[in-house]
Regions:
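Short acidic-glycine-tyrosine-enriched beta hairpin
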Residues: 1-3
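Double-stranded beta-helix
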Residues: 7-47
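Acidic, glycine/proline-rich low-complexity segments that act as flexible tails and inter-domain linkers
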Residues: 48-97, 109, 116-124, 148-229, ...
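Short, structured motif recognition centered on aromatic/hydrophobic residues
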Residues: 97-106, 133-136, 231-241, 270-274
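Winged helix-turn-helix DNA-binding recognition segment
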Residues: 127-131
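Substrate/cofactor-recognition hotspot
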Residues: 134, 140-146
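Preference for long, well-ordered alpha-helical segments
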Residues: 147, 249, 264-275
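Glycine/small-residue-rich hydrophobic helix-like segments
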Residues: 228, 232-237, 241-265
Length: 275
């Protein structure tokens, strides 16, 4: 088609150079370019689709263990058979929800390499760039910028590599003036009426933390468009479960999930897919 530019050529283990082919509105021309690096080639290969490979209907390519076929073939067979056959066929969680949960869990456990493998598959299966960014942004409130930043920069590279322009459309719904009020209302909606004015409670020396919870975590993030309340609570549930050491917080958010419609069976299906 007109105005399309792409490149093609030999595999990365070949000495052949790749070609960039430009197709202007009128006519066509070829431009000889230098070899494509392994990194560029890998980015292209990461645009994956579900494949009926090795009898595993849920398998993607590459997988989180791609690259180990020569050194650890038995492990690869065990892992792929379990993850892409046994696990994906357990329960009836839709693919979009499954991949959103997996991305959140990989953030929680700091699996950045695996995140980079799974993100293109998630995009291919219908998870939108906006949803990806909202998962990443919300993770900051629970995991901290030190843990989220590498995921965010890698996600930006993947999104741009697939042709998505950045920044994406703004999703904020609050202002500096109303973020506390709306954040506290989000707490009430999720956890119950006892959260009304919770940011005013607690010892004076640490009360500011309750305020930050209301205005930043809930006012800045939970009120954003792009994910609904049920999706956001599922994300938080996955962040906390994968991070570990957050038992009380995990129990609290499990209750919040159930309160807004993510019932016990749904949470079991979600956590099963994150295993």
């Amino acid at each position: 088609p007109a105005n399309v530019k792409h490149w093609h050529g030999a595999a990365r283990d070949s000495w052949f150079a790749h070609l960039a082919i430009e197709v202007p509105a009128q006519g066509a021309s070829n431009e000889c370019c230098g070899p494509v690096s392994d990194e560029e080639y890998g980015m292209c290969k990461s645009r994956v689709e579900p494949a009926m490979e090795s009898g595993h209907p849920g398998k993607i390519s590459p997988t989180p263990v791609s690259g180990l076929e020569q050194s650890d073939p038995e492990f690869v067979q065990i892992f792929e058979s379990f993850a892409f056959d046994e696990v994906v066929n357990q329960g009836d969680l839709d693919e979009r929800t499954r991949f959103m949960a997996i991305l959140a869990a990989l953030l929680g456990c700091q699996g950045v390499d695996e995140f980079n493998v799974m993100l293109p598959a998630a995009l291919n299966l219908g998870v939108t760039p906006v949803e990806v960014k909202e998962i990443l942004y919300q993770a900051t409130a629970y995991l901290g910028i030190g843990r989220v930043y590498p995921f965010l920069t890698d996600a930006n590279e993947i999104l741009e590599g697939q042709g998505y322009g950045l920044p994406l459309k703004a999703m904020a719904t609050t202002t500096k003036e109303d973020r506390l009020e709306k954040g506290n209302q989000a707490q009430v909606d999720l956890f119950g009426p006892h959260m009304k004015g919770f940011y005013l409670s607690g010892p004076e020396e640490s009360r500011h933390i309750n305020k930050w919870l209301a205005d930043n975590c809930f006012g800045d993030y939970y009120t954003r468009r792009g994910l609904d309340d049920r999706q956001r609570e599922m994300m938080t549930f996955c962040f906390l479960a994968a991070q570990g050491g957050c038992g009380p917080q995990l129990a609290s958010h499990a209750a919040a999930n159930i309160r807004i419609g993510n019932d016990r069976q749904f949470l079991i299906r979600v956590i099963s897919q994150c295993l």
